[in-house]
């Protein structure tokens, strides 16, 4: 039939424990995103944020006070990252998108990074956090634990039918023709 094969970028996601010396305890792959977000514990009031220190290629960038921090692929730019007000990135593009979720700070913008960038997200303080990959919990996180995201060597291969039309997809998905 009339079909195409699209290759989509994926993320390699490593969870590194504070006491583990940088050795990954969990390795996963994400088509959409990896998220470090706050996790409520018994007896804890809601509404608190998690503090996440970010490194880019091993260099300190900033720390976020937010409900979470999303590292997304272009495919994931229309998933959770979109809900957090991140930009829509053409899914055939290669980039890593870093989007804060409900940040409590002046710098609240998404970064669109080169796919060769290593993004490190370290839980700061004692606030409980969790790492999810494509919506599935992969690890509870404590202070000093890190999640490291890089472009995966492997790609996702998706079969598509008919011509590729990003404009038409966006118009239909988000009701833009009604304007």
Regions found by a protein language model. Give the residues of each.
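ATP/nucleoside-binding phosphotransfer catalytic cores, i.e., glycine-rich phosphate-binding loops
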Residues: 18, 23, 36, 41, ...
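N-terminal start-of-chain detector that recognizes signal peptides
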Residues: 23-26, 43-44, 68-71, 90-96, ...
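Short low-complexity stretches enriched in small and charged residues
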Residues: 23-26, 52-54, 73-79, 103-107, ...
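Residue-level signal for pocket-adjacent positions within structured domains
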Residues: 29, 56, 77, 83-84, ...
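Broad hydrophobic/π-residue packing in well-ordered secondary structure
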Residues: 3-5, 28, 64, 80, ...
């Amino acid at each position: 039939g009339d079909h195409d094969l699209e290759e989509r970028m994926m993320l390699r996601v490593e969870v590194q424990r504070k006491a583990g010396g940088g050795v990954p305890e969990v390795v996963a792959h994400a088509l959409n995103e990896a998220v470090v977000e706050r996790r409520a514990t018994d007896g804890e009031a809601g509404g608190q944020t998690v503090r996440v220190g970010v490194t880019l290629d091993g260099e300190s960038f900033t720390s976020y006070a937010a409900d979470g921090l999303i590292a997304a692929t272009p495919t994931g730019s229309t998933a959770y990252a979109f809900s957090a007000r991140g930009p829509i990135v053409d899914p055939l593009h290669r980039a890593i998108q870093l989007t804060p979720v409900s940040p409590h700070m002046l710098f609240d913008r998404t970064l669109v990074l080169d796919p060769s960038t290593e993004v490190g997200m370290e839980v700061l303080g004692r606030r409980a956090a969790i790492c999810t990959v494509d919506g599935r919990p992969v690890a509870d996180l404590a202070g000093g634990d890190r999640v490291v995201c890089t472009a995966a060597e492997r790609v996702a291969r998706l079969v598509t039918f008919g011509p590729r039309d990003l404009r038409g997809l966006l118009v239909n998905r988000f009701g833009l023709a009604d304007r």
